[in-house]
């Protein structure tokens, strides 16, 4: 019998996950189908009950449900608990277990696409939202030397550091302070939506003080190259867009569900084709 996998979010109509996962199932001869379900926040509890009732094998959880879903599960992986968000659910014989593949997916993409060793690197994270939390914890777990955070609301960045409780040295800066200190960092990461379609003229931070060969990474993938990344390229930065994080978080979820790691290059090709339309 064909297994069913799902995406729960609000909205989900724009998601590239179904096309990416269904191609992977087909490519690997796995009898399964992945479907996106629009789930309003007040119906999340019902949707999770539906996973149990219908025997849905696994679920991806996206905005705005990643934190709200946690108390509805039977078990939450320790890393996901530290991050404070779940994006992947595995239905193991009726027990629903929550994981977070966003942060680990980001780090895998960074290491494999840029061929960088995170250990001993000095990193600046822009933003302190859900995506920043996963990336912060995962980079700390990989042995980063310093992970500083700059955010419009400084108190939110401080809260992230306190709650994630990672064993790494971290300082919080305002955007202006961070811009002045850019030369101190090996890796700059934008975890905000600044510069995303349709506001493509915006940049999260000026790169005027960036040193050459800094890795500049943006988790946005629409557009494929944000204005910020274009600017970094002009300044001889090593750039990375958000396609890798999206693909690797999906690939790690796929592996949690099936025990098989999919062909990420094929996944990437499909996602880029869809984005180019």
Swiss-Prot record:
Pfam families with a match to the protein in the record: SDH_C, Shikimate_DH, Shikimate_dh_N
Q: Name one GO biological process term.
A: chorismate biosynthetic process
Q: In which pathway does it act?
A: Metabolic intermediate biosynthesis; chorismate biosynthesis; chorismate from D-erythrose 4-phosphate and phosphoenolpyruvate: step 4/7
Reactions that this protein is recorded to catalyse: shikimate + NADP(+) = 3-dehydroshikimate + NADPH + H(+)
Which SUPFAM superfamilies does the entry link to? Aminoacid dehydrogenase-like, N-terminal domain, NAD(P)-binding Rossmann-fold domains
The residues that the entry says bind NADP(+) are: 127-131, 151-156, 219, 242
Enzyme superclass (EC):
oxidoreductase
Disulfide partners = none
Family affiliation: Belongs to the shikimate dehydrogenase family.
Q: Quaternary structure?
A: Homodimer.
Q: What is this protein called?
A: Shikimate dehydrogenase (NADP(+))
The opening ranks of the lineage are: Bacteria, Bacillati, Bacillota, Bacilli, Bacillales
């Amino acid at each position: 019998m064909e297994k069913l996998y799902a995406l729960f979010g609000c909205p989900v109509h724009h998601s590239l996950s179904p096309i990416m996962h269904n191609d992977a199932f087909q490519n690997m001869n796995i009898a399964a189908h992945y479907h996106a379900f629009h789930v309003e926040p007040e119906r999340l509890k019902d949707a999770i009950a539906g996973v149990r009732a219908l025997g849905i094998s696994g679920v991806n959880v996206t905005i705005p449900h990643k934190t709200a879903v946690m108390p509805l599960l039977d078990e939450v992986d320790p890393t996901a608990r530290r991050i404070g968000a779940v994006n992947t659910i595995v239905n193991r014989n009726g027990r629903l277990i929550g994981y977070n593949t966003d942060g680990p997916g980001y780090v895998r993409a960074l290491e494999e696409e840029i061929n960088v060793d995170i250990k001993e690197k000095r990193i600046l994270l822009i933003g302190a939202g859900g995506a920043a939390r996963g990336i912060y914890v995962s980079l700390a777990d990989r042995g980063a030397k310093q992970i500083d955070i700059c955010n419009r609301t400084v108190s939110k960045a401080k809260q992230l550091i306190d709650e994630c409780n990672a064993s790494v040295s971290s300082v919080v800066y305002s955007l202006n302070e961070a811009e002045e200190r850019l030369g101190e960092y090996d890796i700059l990461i934008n975890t905000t939506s600044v510069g995303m379609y349709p506001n493509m003229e915006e940049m999260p931070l000026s790169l005027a003080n960036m040193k050459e060969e800094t890795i500049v990474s943006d988790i946005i993938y629409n557009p494929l190259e944000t204005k910020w990344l274009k600017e970094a390229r002009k300044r001889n930065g090593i750039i990375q867009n958000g396609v890798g994080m999206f693909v690797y978080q999906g690939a790690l979820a796929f592996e949690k569900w099936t025990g098989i790691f999919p062909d990420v290059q094929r996944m990437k090709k499909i996602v880029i084709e869809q984005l180019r339309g």
